[in-house]
From Swiss-Prot:
NCBIfam families: PRK05260.1. Keywords: Calcium, Cell cycle, Cell division, Chromosome partition, Cytoplasm, DNA condensation. One of its GO terms (molecular function) is calcium ion binding. Involved in chromosome condensation, segregation and cell cycle progression. May participate in facilitating chromosome segregation by condensation DNA from both sides of a centrally located replisome during cell division. Not required for mini-F plasmid partitioning. Probably acts via its interaction with MukB and MukE. Overexpression results in anucleate cells. It has a calcium binding activity. Belongs to the MukF family. It comes from Shigella boydii serotype 4 (strain Sb227). It comes from the Bacteria. This is Chromosome partition protein MukF. It is found in: Cytoplasm, Nucleoid. Interacts, and probably forms a ternary complex, with MukE and MukB via its C-terminal region. The complex formation is stimulated by calcium or magnesium. It is required for an interaction between MukE and MukB. Transmembrane segments: none annotated. Gene3D superfamilies: Chromosome partition protein MukF, middle domain, MukF, C-terminal domain, Winged helix-like DNA-binding domain superfamily/Winged helix DNA-binding domain. The lineage of its organism: Bacteria, Pseudomonadati, Pseudomonadota, Gammaproteobacteria, Enterobacterales.
């Protein structure tokens, strides 16, 4: 950034308004550096809480600190990193207690880059992907054309290293900035709901829909260009297979493939996590509305009783006992008086109670593929099963089918290192990425 777009008073007011502060002592800074180093060695760019604790243990040993309180001090350090916006924490309702951590742009800026702030722009992303596609196509054409070492350095390695890789890093940074924006939107929604949730409903809906739309727009743009980018990378990789002296090009292509897979994968995972948060907020609003109805009725009833002598009123009721049973949990005890006994066909059965039975049925049905040595396409099989169940059961049924399928065998395509295509498994946007199982 060659020049500042804001004046000093504006920057000071902005920093004061957002209450920015960073406090990193030497041990905490060392911990952040250790996290960044280990994170750079991972292909998915994500770390679990256990991996963060292991990194903290190395730092603690280096500073000759006691190992008796390592768990408590590591937890405090992780929470402090999250509070200072150096790490982002993501939790999932399906994997309760297992959090995913990613370095924020601020964390990356401290350890590797200079700090940058950018707004998400679909046009900018489309232009970046267009430039990448052009560079990759020219590099692939040059690779298939062949030539001496200077030709490979000038026309293949250089564009991949200094153009494609940098744009991939820029897109990755954009995604991390979107992570930060999601956390800010969550904070804004929490503040709105704490003040006056009735007046905040429309604002919350706007924030939720805007963020969902932005995430979907980002992912759609990436997926639309992802196949073409991977195809050109594969062309370059095929061209280097006959040359033993081009390991540096082959390694760079592999790194670019990993970056592209990580970008697209995290985009879809981020959407799934945001959908869970969206449902949580809507559930909270619905609960608040139900509670508010009861609160308004109780308040009016108290006022009517208090002003009875000034403004007399009469109350007509059909069942005196029903007037006393105003709490939902007490009314639940009287349901049988209203509905009577349900027929056996309508008796509700918890899904967990039939889980083992369903797993056994699916295991028996899938065993036919192994017996006949027929390839098993998970995308088609899961979609066929989900069409037989309501949408609320799709996640549980899909998990059972996949668990049983992977026990039968493996896909030989997994050993090639190439990613499988995403296949839709229902009409609500759910997808699965898996090669065809053909070795039992």
């Amino acid at each position: 950034m060659s020049e500042f777009s804001q004046t000093v008073p504006e920057l000071v007011a902005w920093a004061r308004k957002n209450d920015f502060s960073i406090s990193l002592q030497v041990d905490r800074l060392s911990f952040l550096l250790a996290v960044a180093t280990l994170n750079g060695e991972r292909l998915d760019g994500e770390m679990s809480e256990g991996e963060l604790v292991d990194a903290f243990r190395h730092v603690s040993d280096a500073f000759e600190q006691t190992s008796e309180t390592i768990g408590v001090r590591a937890n405090n350090a992780i929470n402090d990193m999250v509070r200072q916006r150096l790490l982002n924490r993501f939790t999932s309702e399906q994997a309760e207690g297992n959090a995913i951590y990613r370095l924020t742009p601020l964390g990356i800026g401290i350890t590797d880059y200079y700090i940058r702030q950018r707004e998400f722009s679909t046009l900018r992303l489309s232009m970046q992907l267009s430039i990448v596609a052009g560079e990759l196509k020219r590099a692939a054409d040059a690779a298939e054309e062949g030539g001496d070492e200077f030709h490979w350095h000038r026309n293949v390695y250089a564009p991949l290293k200094y153009s494609v890789a940098e744009i991939f890093d820029s897109i990755d940074l954009t995604q991390r900035l979107m992570d930060e924006q999601q956390q800010q939107v969550k904070d804004d929604i929490a503040q709105l709901l704490n003040k006056d949730w009735r007046a905040a409903i429309s604002s919350c809906e706007l924030l939720l829909s805007e963020t969902s739309g932005t995430l979907r727009e980002l992912q759609d743009t990436l997926e639309a260009a992802g196949d073409k980018l991977q195809a050109n990378l594969l062309r370059i990789q095929d061209a280097t297979m006959t040359h033993d002296d081009l390991h540096f090009v082959d390694r760079l292509v592999f790194d670019l493939q990993s970056k592209l897979d990580r970008i697209i994968s995290w985009g879809q995972q981020s959407i799934d996590l945001w959908i869970g948060y969206d449902r949580h907020v809507h559930k909270f609003i619905r609960t608040a509305i139900d509670m508010d109805k009861n609160r308004v009725f109780a308040q009016r009833l108290r006022q009517s009783v208090q002003t009875y002598f000034d403004e007399p009123w009469a109350l007509t009721y059909a069942n005196a006992d029903r007037l006393l049973d105003m709490r939902d949990e007490e009314m639940a005890l009287r349901d049988e008086e209203v509905t009577g006994e349900l027929p056996e066909d309508l008796e509700y059965e918890e899904f967990n109670e039939i889980r083992e039975q369903l797993a056994a049925i699916i295991e028996e049905q899938l065993a036919v593929y192994k017996t006949r040595q027929v390839p098993l396409d998970l995308g088609l099989v899961v979609r066929e099963y989900l069409s037989q169940y309501p949408r609320a059961r799709h996640f549980d049924v899909a998990r059972i089918v996949i668990d049983q399928a992977v026990r039968l065998g493996v896909a030989q395509a997994d050993f090639t290192g190439l990613p499988a295509k995403w296949q839709p498994i229902n009409d609500y946007g759910a997808k699965v990425q898996a090669h065809v199982i053909d070795k039992y």
